[in-house]
Amino acid sequence: MAELNFKAIEEKWQKRWLEAKIFEPNIRDKPKEKKFYITVAFPYLSGHLHVGHARTYTIPDVIARFKRMQGYNVLFPMAWHITGSPIVGIAERIKNRDPKTIWIYRDVYKVPEEILWTFEDPINIVKYFMKAAKETFIRAGFSVDWSREFYTTSLFPPFSKFIEWQFWKLKEKGYIVKGAHRVRWDPVVGTPLGDHDLMEGEDVPILDYIIIKFELRENGEVIYLPAATLRPETVYGVTNMWVNPNATYVKAKVRRKDKEETWIVSKEAAYKLSFQDREIEVIEEFKGEKLIGKYVRNPVSGDEVIILPAEFVDPDNATGVVMSVPAHAPFDHVALEDLKRETEILEKYDIDPRIVENITYISLIKLEGYGDFPAVEEVNKLGIKSQKDKEKLEQATKTIYKAEYHKGIFKVPPYEGKPVQEVKEAIAKEMLEKGIAEIMYEFAEKNVISRFGNRAVIKIIHDQWFIDYGNPEWKEKARKALERMKILPETRRAQFEAIIDWLDKKACARKIGLGTPLPWDPEWVIESLSDSTIYMAYYTISRHINKLRQEGKLDPEKLTPEFFDYIFLEEFSEDKEKELEKKTGIPAEIIHEMKEEFEYWYPLDWRCSGKDLIPNHLTFFIFNHVAIFREEHWPKGIAVNGFGTLEGQKMSKSKGNVLNFIDAIEENGADVVRLYIMSLAEHDSDFDWRRKEVGKLRKQIERFYELISQFAEYEVKGNVELKDIDRWMLHRLNKAIKETTNALEEFRTRTAVQWAFYSIMNDLRWYLRRTEGRDDEAKRYVLRTLADVWVRLMAPFTPHICEELWEKLGGEGFVSLAKWPEPVEEWWNETIEAEEEFIRSVMEDIKEIIEVAKIENAKRAYIYTAEDWKWKVAEVVSEKRDFKSSMEELMKDSEIRKHGKEVAKIVQKLIKERTFDVKRINEEKALREAKEFMEKELGIEIIINPTEDKGGKKKQAMPLKPAIFIE
């Protein structure tokens, strides 16, 4: 057969689908009970989609196609997300001729150079990638209703008015507040940063450090050395301070509110603190070595402690000053031990080594399983020798901190006898109230980079608009919705619950970037994670909006909150529709149809997205729906999918390790790409794209096409006389239908592919071997029937090839709209399946015996099937499942009693091997019917149950495990 031209077939059917508009559902076609509404997170248009995205979008398309074939009225729409600063940042970097950005867009995304330079205008980036993304989705065969397409921001005014309405609603309900809050901030551009505004570090948490002000007195001046800690309760155990002798520190005037103090912190810390409600005036810069050997006073205990050198202190983390608590901090203990050994370091700073030798550890926490100094014990236990054992030190630190926090009891008055969890909060609160400590916000990691290419800081913003996800009543409604929702996989539910619990105020607007202006404060632009939470409702009316827009009959400015209130929140009212017609210019009957569409399609059945969006978009999606819509319109389910890697490596456009979705289609064909990514892993697991494996799958799809094309030529006649092997094939086909259907209902795409493609292919291969030489009506009937079912089962995965084959089969209309196969009751035959499995097993056993025993020129196989009484034993053991009750039951049978000792051995064997699911079959009949096939396959004579007991094997025969002798 000539090589299959995937591209030609795909283009043919994509054209026909679009012309016939078969994916544009009409609410008049089916009752609401038969509607199915599924959406997926619309793509952000800052570049080409890669094969990781292909997974995210193919899963819902497969499900949409499956449900459509099941007879549902399916809505699967698509739109484009362009809100926020990333696109503006890209334009800025291209304008500045940033080499890395230019390389990504020219060499990785393959943007022609003459087009690339137009990207200095962000609108041109949007236009280019919007067109490319739509082409990719069409080329992928996605069954999208393109009549509902739109894009975000004020560049598409109707949607922008919808977002304005959403925000007025949130504000009315008290869910939008103004105030001060910590945010990620681009210090160069001067804007808050949401998750989508970051190039790196979107998952990096913000830590609340307590900075404790240790006093350093010089010439009568009080100077504070603020030590940053996440364990304020350990301030009672400080034995010394650490600074990095090689780092640059500053002495600075720090003004906060009406208070002014002099601090010494690292140069990096001074910069960061200037964004956190502090005015910093640097007086002096110097190296940390200047501080070594000086003493500071602990503001809590009053103890004077020495400042010691430590290169492990990172000046770019918090204040660059660390308090040492060696009894409870493994790093501190090991650093002191290193100093004791390396006295030359101390001598360099004129510190008497005896000072370090005489440092006394202070025990603060009683911890079961440890003595007074848990850090010392853990270091010794792990065999840590020096600060170079960094991995082990981090392990020890995690172990001690976790154990002390959860199980530790404080030993120092006035908190003696209280749990560490409680003491930690109390001590922090007390120090903050007394003014001897403050809070500094810091990232847990350094790699938090904005889309503008700048390193982010944490800033306290005043007069910022926030969505108050911390509102207790709102949280309760979100929990209620989550309880009612299906979450796939179910294991992700706990993550949603935790996020609802800790979610707090979220900055919802920026001063720069693309988006919708905040309606009551238009200097602010609504950010990308805030205008993408309820657009699934807009999809339901966007078809009508788009049509009016194309006809020039829509004035977006007249789409007021009153209009959206009626469509999405109120009851049907003819009077209201007439009133809105006057106000909007939209005919009352169109307004009525819009409301009908919303009421028909809502609630949303499934929301699909990647697992990275659980902490933000997907949880915000729940919150915003429960805030705005009636309970009957709350979403019903969320399906979360895993990530993709490329040849075992994480995909990264900055490293060039990325495969564009469109390139994968060009290289392999859409159906090959679709089937490959669906077959690799279940929807919730990660997958790895390997080019070599894709090539193998292409050949298998070509074989599928070849087989169906061949079977399509067979004419089907009724009343054919089927043989057992024919019935076996139909039974297996039934099983494939059932298992594929069950898997797709639960989004288990890999399992579905295993049954719909690989299982049928393997069963067919066996069937063709078993029926080789036959060309009768029964075989033709089975193969033609199989072709009809198989093409429909594969249609959600490989729609283009299946449309072509459906046409060859003479199927009515599009296979995309054909009836999904259902099991045929009369095809079920568990007995025949068991018999066929038995034949396979016996053949494998014969091959194994010949191979293991190294029998050359084997001529005959003598097969002895189990006697009837052994079947009775197996059946009783299957029912009773334990030795005593099985033997009691069996000994009631006089025939079985004759074999007493042998019965006991068999029962023990069956129980040990847990052989409980034994279905009786006529082994001899099955073997005799397959005798000719077995002889041909094995190349030896098969003799079944001869009277002669060859090799004394007969007594070894067990149910489903006959005795075999080879000569």
UniProtKB/Swiss-Prot annotation:
Query: What are the record keywords, sorted?
Result: Aminoacyl-tRNA synthetase, ATP-binding, Cytoplasm, Ligase, Nucleotide-binding, Protein biosynthesis
EC number(s) given by UniProt: 6.1.1.4
Which residue ranges does the UniProt annotation give for the motif 'KMSKS' region?
650-654
Give, as one word, the top-level EC class.
ligase
GO annotation terms (biological process): leucyl-tRNA aminoacylation
Cite the binding residues for ATP: 653
Under Gene3D superfamilies, the record lists:
Class I aminoacyl-tRNA synthetases (RS), HUPs, Isoleucyl-tRNA Synthetase, Domain 1, leucyl-tRNA synthetase, Valyl/Leucyl/Isoleucyl-tRNA synthetase, editing domain
Q: Do you know which SUPFAM superfamilies this protein is assigned to?
A: Anticodon-binding domain of a subclass of class I aminoacyl-tRNA synthetases, Nucleotidylyl transferase, ValRS/IleRS/LeuRS editing domain
| Chain positions of motif 'HIGH' region | 43-53
Where does it mainly reside? cytoplasm
Superkingdom of this protein's organism? Archaea
What CDD domains does this protein's entry cite?
Answer: Anticodon_Ia_Leu_AEc, LeuRS_core
Q: Which GO terms describe its cellular component?
A: cytoplasm
List the HAMAP family: Leu_tRNA_synth_A
**Database matches in PANTHER family:** LEUCINE--TRNA LIGASE, CYTOPLASMIC (PTHR45794:SF1), LEUCYL-TRNA SYNTHETASE (PTHR45794)
Q: Which protein are we looking at?
A: Leucine--tRNA ligase
Q: What is the species of this protein?
A: Pyrococcus horikoshii (strain ATCC 700860 / DSM 12428 / JCM 9974 / NBRC 100139 / OT-3)
